[in-house]
Amino acid sequence: MATYMMDWSAVWIDQMRRHNEMNGGMDCAAYWDVGEEARNYWKMVEQDGEEFVKVLLDQIEIKSTFRVLDIGAGPGTLAIPFSNMAAHVTAVEPSDAMASVLRENLEERGIENVDCVQKKWEEVDLERDLKPPYDLVVASFSLGMTDIKRAIQKMMAVSFGRVYLAWFAGDTSWDVQAREVSALLFGDVAYHPMPKSDVLFNVLYQMGVYPNVWVFPLRMHHRFPSFDDIVNYFGGQYRAETDDQRAKLRDYLSQVVERDGDSWTMMYHFLNMMIWWDNSHQET
């Protein structure tokens, strides 16, 4: 099919559906409610999150009078620094575990200008749950929505300033790893990654939104107390159930993790795009 005839919203929906089906029907919000995933992520943010926060804050203009909407706020990676710079922040976070960590972080820091809305963005009622309009709307690595076009339309409906979407560009290190492990453990099994920034850009383009883009790399360290903890963690991630599968996974992991003092580290590398536009120049 010719590119100009492609329905990029449908492409996103199909790729996200395939990805979720591959994960047993688990969407992004449900993933963070498994075990200690949310708290583990916050530990990684504390170790490595400053790099991304600096990348973002160096690029955007935020004033003390601004009202900010943070979609998929997670543990407060951006909501916390935003609270020190803006008049008000609305943090939308669907995961029970992530929302719990977020509220704990806000309470520990005595932050009172952040409202938490614990819902999927798709389920948020713009009039009942929010207080629009917002000067700044941000969705940072939180675009796990199936219908991304509708999700963006909702963002634009509550914004009269800039909208920033941070998302992955190309294969992440965990995409590469998942393909290798799947082939090792299960043979010729198709791996379906989430749709990436190329699809997102084209969705926006077909909506009549011609965004600005900048590309930036990031890395994060996932630390474990022991090598056995790594094997147990990724054994669950990759559904390594038999002794043979566990042995193969153990050998694979021994080649890709690093010893770091008394702990072991899995390094994640990923290239990203920040896609943004001034919504005051768009028709919603």
Annotate each PLM feature.
Residues 2-62, 65-74, 164-187:
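Conserved class I S-adenosyl-L-methionine
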Residues 77-78, 82-123:
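Class I SAM-dependent methyltransferase SAM/SAH-binding core
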Residues 134-150:
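A short SAM/SAH-binding and catalytic strip from SAM-dependent methyltransferases
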Residues 149-164:
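A short glycine-rich, Lys/Arg-flanked "PGG" loop and its adjoining helix->strand segment in the class I
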Residues 192-208:
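Short alpha-helix
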Residues 210-284:
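Conserved Class I S-adenosyl-L-methionine
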